[in-house]
UniProtKB/Swiss-Prot annotation:
UniProt-listed Pfam families: GCV_H (PF01597)
Reported function: The glycine cleavage system catalyzes the degradation of glycine. The H protein shuttles the methylamine group of glycine from the P protein to the T protein.
Upper classification of the organism: Bacteria, Bacillati, Cyanobacteriota, Cyanophyceae, Synechococcales
Organism listed in the record: Prochlorococcus marinus (strain MIT 9303)
Assembly and oligomerization: The glycine cleavage system is composed of four proteins: P, T, L and H.
Record-linked PROSITE patterns: BIOTINYL_LIPOYL (PS50968), LIPOYL (PS00189)
Keyword annotations: Lipoyl
UniProt protein name: Glycine cleavage system H protein
Length: 129
């Protein structure tokens, strides 16, 4: 299955994305990861005000197949979570790159985004997985 990934997104090896929006970064998981998980039944996210460190676990997604940890693609302060995916995980399932985003971070160092894969590189990576 071929996936479309927004050109302005940056992706971690662990399938989380980061999208710069002004001075904040929106974080979620890729459509590829959602597809691999299957039906998502539960999402666990940290609390607003928590500090995230790039590469460390910040929550989890539970599907009928597995529970997968979520890893921060960028370091910073959590300023907003998407409450709707907590109450309705199907939003993540149905629109992971849009309404199914997970959280918004005020980055400690926006340059960390450059360490993530661009959409084309990520698409090539998942094409062989």
């Amino acid at each position: 299955m071929a996936f479309q990934f927004p050109d302005h997104f940056r992706f971690a090896d662990t399938h989380e994305y980061a999208s710069l929006d002004g001075d904040l970064v929106r974080v979620g998981i890729s459509a590829f990861a959602v597809d691999q998980l299957g039906d998502i039944v539960f999402v666990d996210l940290p609390e607003v005000g928590d500090l995230l460190n790039r590469g460390t676990t910040f929550g989890s997604v539970e599907s009928v197949k597995a529970v997968e940890d979520l890893h921060a693609p960028i370091s910073g302060e959590l300023v907003r979570i998407n409450e709707s995916v907590l109450s309705s995980p199907d939003e993540l399932q149905n629109d992971p790159h849009g309404e199914g985003w997970l959280l918004v971070v005020r980055p400690a160092d926006p340059a960390q985004l450059q360490d993530l894969m661009d959409a084309a590189t990520y698409a090539n990576k998942v094409a062989v997985e």
